[in-house]
């Protein structure tokens, strides 16, 4: 499957751990919401818990923006549950506020182009899907470097601003900063 910005995101479905229980989820469950579908290599590793905890701690910020973060790895739902139930001081998550989707068949990771076939794990991909199911942004990191929650929120704010106002967001834009009206770009460029 080929991914393309501006085209429908690949459908996904599977068993996730949601609020400490197993639940079947799919992309269609989130129609009308923005979705960040994130991939990480493995439970019980080093960078992964830092990312999961950071996104979990920001869950309310995403919810305020009508967005849901879903993180997935090729681990089973049982591994996810054990990871969630293990205290942070012991290398676990100690409870989280976002779903962890299991992808033991590797289908979701493969469909999103992040699967490292010979290792059976995913690169650190982050995909922003709009409320209509359209893929709007892709970030893929190599395994040793984690992602920024602040940057994910900034991107979400920017895409939502563009949707609402029709103006475009320049480099390093943050909510409340000047944007560019494509019908009158001189207004922006005369000040910047």
Swiss-Prot record:
Keywords: Antioxidant, Cytoplasm, Disulfide bond, Nucleus, Oxidoreductase, Peroxidase, Phosphoprotein, Redox-active center. It holds the Pfam family AhpC-TSA. InterPro entries: AhpC/TSA, Peroxiredoxin, Peroxiredoxin_AhpC-typ, Peroxiredoxin_C, Thioredoxin-like_sf, Thioredoxin_domain. Changing residue 169 to S: No nuclear accumulation of pap1. GO terms for cellular component: cytoplasm; cytosol; nucleus. Changing residue 191 to D: Peroxide reduction reduced. It catalyses: a hydroperoxide + [thioredoxin]-dithiol = an alcohol + [thioredoxin]-disulfide + H2O. The active site is at residue 48. One of its GO terms (biological process) is positive regulation of p38MAPK cascade. The enzyme can be inactivated by further oxidation of the cysteine sulfenic acid (C(P)-SOH) to sulphinic acid (C(P)-SO2H) instead of its condensation to a disulfide bond. It can be reactivated by forming a transient disulfide bond with sulfiredoxin srx1, which reduces the cysteine sulfinic acid in an ATP- and Mg-dependent manner. CDD domains: PRX_Typ2cys (cd03015). Its EC number is 1.11.1.24. The modification Phosphoserine is found at residues 105, 148. Residues 3-161 form the Thioredoxin domain. The keyword Disulfide bond applies. SUPFAM superfamilies: Thioredoxin-like. Homodimer; disulfide-linked, upon oxidation. Interacts with srx1 in response to oxidative stress. Interacts with pap1 via transient disulfide linkages. Belongs to the peroxiredoxin family. AhpC/Prx1 subfamily. Thiol-specific peroxidase that catalyzes the reduction of hydrogen peroxide and organic hydroperoxides to water and alcohols, respectively. Plays a role in cell protection against oxidative stress by detoxifying peroxides and as sensor of hydrogen peroxide-mediated signaling events. Relays hydrogen peroxide as a signal to the transcription factor pap1 by inducing the formation of intramolecular disulfide bonds in pap1, which causes its nuclear accumulation and activation. This is Peroxiredoxin tpx1.
